[in-house]
Regions:
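Non-transmembrane, interaction-prone segments in cytosolic or luminal domains
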Residues: 5, 58, 73-75, 89, ...
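Flexible "cap/lid" subdomain of the alpha/beta-hydrolase fold that forms the substrate-access gate
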Residues: 3, 31-32, 82-90, 97-98, ...
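Conserved HGGG/HGGXW glycine-rich cap/lid loop of the alpha/beta-hydrolase fold
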Residues: 15, 22-77, 99, 109-114, ...
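Aromatic/hydrophobic pocket-lining residues that form π-stacking "cages" and hydrophobic walls in ligand
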Residues: 92, 116
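An N-terminal hydrophobic leader/cap segment in hydrolases
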Residues: 1-11, 17-20
């Protein structure tokens, strides 16, 4: 990157949660509508590294690690998909307020596209443009009864044992070597 990024944690009001934020060009183009980047599943700010200089050429750019990803706080999410979605959307709104952005261009990739869409539906007054790059979301899971019929008992037992472990736990344990 040729532009000098500013990286910092943004504390979310009323919680102990923090969102890791990379910003570029926030002073020299402060009159332009900022571009906010939301990464996808299993990703983080690094997803955008090859695009940041170009994207920040003539406007402020913010890339955030969504809660539970990258350097952002690990929080307990609801097991209800709709509630978990609202938790993530609210964290983006709390972040926007903390940073002081009135309106933004919101770009989401993959799961970030799903979250960007949900955010825009809930906070349309804050989104000037919505850009979706390969967006997707998780369908609601089948009822417990259907699920228990479809999955063999031994698989359910293994799932109970490993469910506390996140698939990216090994990467987090690697610390800086995992980047």
């Amino acid at each position: 990157m040729s532009s000098r990024p500013i990286c910092r944690y943004i504390a979310l009001s009323g919680t102990a949660s923090r969102i890791w934020t990379l910003s570029l060009n926030t002073e020299s183009c402060s009159t332009k509508t900022p571009l906010v980047l939301l990464h996808g599943m299993g990703s983080g700010i690094a997803l955008w590294v090859l695009n940041l200089d170009y994207l920040a050429h003539n406007r402020p750019v913010y890339a955030i690690d969504v809660l539970g990803f990258g350097r952002s706080s690990r929080v307990s999410f609801s097991s209800d998909p709709a509630e978990a979605e609202q938790q993530l959307v609210q964290s983006i709104e709390d972040w926007r307020k903390a940073v002081g952005i009135d309106r933004m261009i919101l770009l989401g990739h993959s799961l970030g596209g799903y979250l960007a869409t949900s955010y825009a539906l809930n906070h349309a007054e804050c989104v000037q443009h919505l850009i979706l790059a390969d967006p997707w979301g998780f369908p609601q899971s089948p009822s417990q009864l259907e699920q228990s019929r479809m999955i063999p008992r031994w698989v359910r037992m293994v799932r109970c044992i490993i469910s506390p472990f996140n698939p990216f736990s090994g990467l987090r344990l690697a610390g800086p070597w995992g980047e």
